[in-house]
Amino acid sequence: MAEINKQSNKWEQEEVSNENNWELAEEESVDWRGRPSNPNKHGGMRAALFVLGLQAFEIMGIAAVGNNLITYVINEMHFPLSKAANIVTNFVGTIFIFALLGGYLSDAFLGSFWTIIIFGFVELSGFILLSVQAHLPQLKPPKCNPLIDQTCEEAKGFKAMIFFMALYLVALGSGCVKPNMIAHGADQFSQSHPKQSKRLSSYFNAAYFAFSMGELIALTLLVWVQTHSGMDIGFGVSAAAMTMGIISLVSGTMYFRNKRPRRSIFTPIAHVIVAAILKRKLASPSDPRMLHGDHHVANDVVPSSTLPHTPRFRFLDKACIKIQDTNTKESPWRLCTVTQVEQVKTLISLVPIFASTIVFNTILAQLQTFSVQQGSSMNTRLSNSFHIPPASLQAIPYIMLIFLVPLYDSFLVPFARKLTGHNSGIPPLTRIGIGLFLSTFSMVSAAMLEKKRRDSSVLDGRILSIFWITPQFLIFGISEMFTAVGLIEFFYKQSAKGMESFLMALTYCSYSFGFYFSSVLVSVVNKITSTSVDSKGWLGENDLNKDRLDLFYWLLAVLSLLNFLSYLFWSRWNIKSSRRNNTNVVGDENI
């Protein structure tokens, strides 16, 4: 232990405010051979750069597939528009559902590094199979233009099976890789070390920058390849990008500090719930100091220091009541510590914050489906010889963000730190709220543009330039920079030891629920607005000039505003319940 202190002091040459926690964090991390990590050799931004490389290449590959998938599904597989939109949203939603599996396997059994390696190859195999399926004519329906010929043969049977098998291999691999990329990079920093804590916040911004770079290349270069060289070549390039990402990760093996997996991450949570139920008839003591706080079980998923008692969810406090007049040691299924109970309370308090981002991601789903189709109905000509692929519209915010994110981290964050005293500059909960508020205006812009585009096409016979669609993508890009990064940082800093990857997976589940909700919303809106046999609803036609996409966007704008108001309530509740005991938590901020 003394040797670790010596190395840590030599590394930073400054006083560590919480030395015991720093030492414990170092003991819990190991190198690739399972030996205790050395702060002079392992971790830090140098190690995180290899993970950022993987993140850029992985998002490059998956974004090139996902963002142009609706065009492929309609033009090559011949699915109708509404069904194609649901295929895309279900695919993206499933990716983020699989994130839960990846987070669980990492925290409980494999560790983040090996989880990424194993499922990285699963994702790679899916890209390769997609490329083969797109290349061989016998694995696709006969060529046909669905906009001209209404009798195009839809992919069915063996052809559909191959397509969906490849698609969901990609979903399984990407889903299990995503939360572990973020967690593994963040694991290279210690929250208990003041300087490292600031670097952790910068890492989350750097991770979003890597994400933006990957998205930008995917939505420009890779989509251009798909459009001009064919989807088979495009899917092959995605496979090559994933290969480069795996190579980037493996190259950093010698520098990583890895956290050991901790058996079942759900058992300590179950201990608290079962103990509280078994003692439900007991009265909770008015003095929290009477609650049991010294019963620690080896390998329990608890933070390195104890958590103070909070008055929220008082029913769970009954799990800490020690039965009097007995000398026998109670089972962990009947007696828990205050820290264990408080950790479960924290997880429960994250639920409304998590739920508040679902509608936000439903809006994202529209930008990857209907907004791409909007672009297809507009004038894509940039010059006599160059047309903008509609899927490349989504590159618009990322072009801006590759400049905005470094400026945010270099200038706005230091300035905000002086005002707020928070290591992140703008605290995570505030950051989430800013993004949720801005997303409403993305849908307002989209609705106004669609009304103008439809009227120009139907009434005047004019086709608007594709540049009119820019504002809705720009506004949402800025909102995503605030909400997505804020949510990841908030969840990571609230997570218990050994649950980092799983909590990161929950942030991705917000994407999943958002995309699934989009599918449900489209179906419900179509059903409600289908007034007759001839009317298929707002989104039931394959022709946007006959659909009422503008009204659907207005509906989403209203839902987004209501969602923001709901978030204000729950975020204030989260802050208030945390401040009652003067706990120094990431959510202690003004909104």
Swiss-Prot record:
Gene Ontology MF, one: transmembrane transporter activity
Region spans: Disordered: 1-38
Annotated GO CC locations: membrane
Chain ranges passing through the membrane: 47-67, 85-105, 109-129, 157-177, 204-224, 233-253, 347-367, 395-415, 429-449, 463-483, 502-522, 551-571
Cellular compartment(s): Membrane
Biased composition, class Polar residues, residue ranges: 1-10
Disulfide linkage: none
Principal subcellular localisation of the protein: membrane
InterPro entries reported for this sequence: MFS_trans_sf, POT_fam, PTR2_symporter_CS
Gene3D superfamilies: MFS general substrate transporter like domains
Induction annotation: Down-regulated upon nematode infection.
Keywords, ordered alphabetically: Membrane, Transmembrane, Transmembrane helix, Transport
Keyword match Transport: yes
Membrane topology: Multi-pass membrane protein
GO biological process, one term: response to nematode
Tissue expression from the record: Expressed in flowers. Detected in roots and siliques.
Presence of keyword Membrane: yes
Family: Belongs to the major facilitator superfamily. Proton-dependent oligopeptide transporter (POT/PTR) (TC 2.A.17) family.
Classification via PANTHER family: OLIGOPEPTIDE TRANSPORTER-RELATED (PTHR11654)
Name of the featured protein: Protein NRT1/ PTR FAMILY 4.3
